[in-house]
Amino acid sequence: MPGKIKKNLFGYNEEMGFTKEELKEMSLSCPSLLCTDVQRKVVPQFEVLHNEAKIPHDVLAKFPSSLLAPWVPTRSRLRFLQSLGRDQFDPKLANYVSPELLTVKSDEIFCEKAARCSPVLFDDYQRTL
C-alpha cells in the first residue's frame, strides 16, 4: 500500500475516529478520499460536519463525498440553517438535512431543498458575515 494512502487511512481511523467498516464503505463509494490530503482538505471539513453540525460518523460514512467539499461554504450554510432553526441532521427525525444537501455545489439547490427559502435570503445572510 503506498505511503500516502496508508497515512490517509491512519488519519481517517485514528484522528477522525472512523471504524474500519466505515472506511471500507467510504472507500468503495468515493475512492478519491484515499488520495486526498487529509490534513489540509478533509480535517477542516470534518470539523464542521462532525464537531459543529454533530453529524455522526455512520451518517458521514454514507455520504463520503461531503468530506471533500470546501469547508468555508459548508460552515456558512450550517450557520444559516442554525439561524433558521433548520439544522436537523438526524436521519430518524423530520426535516432531516443530509450532509449531501449541506455540501451540494449549487446554492439554489441548497436553498430549495435544505433551507427551504429563496436564494436571495441566503445571499443577504452571507453579506452579513
Annotate each predicted stretch with a short phrase.
Residues M1-L129:
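Long amphipathic alpha-helical repeat/alpha-solenoid cores
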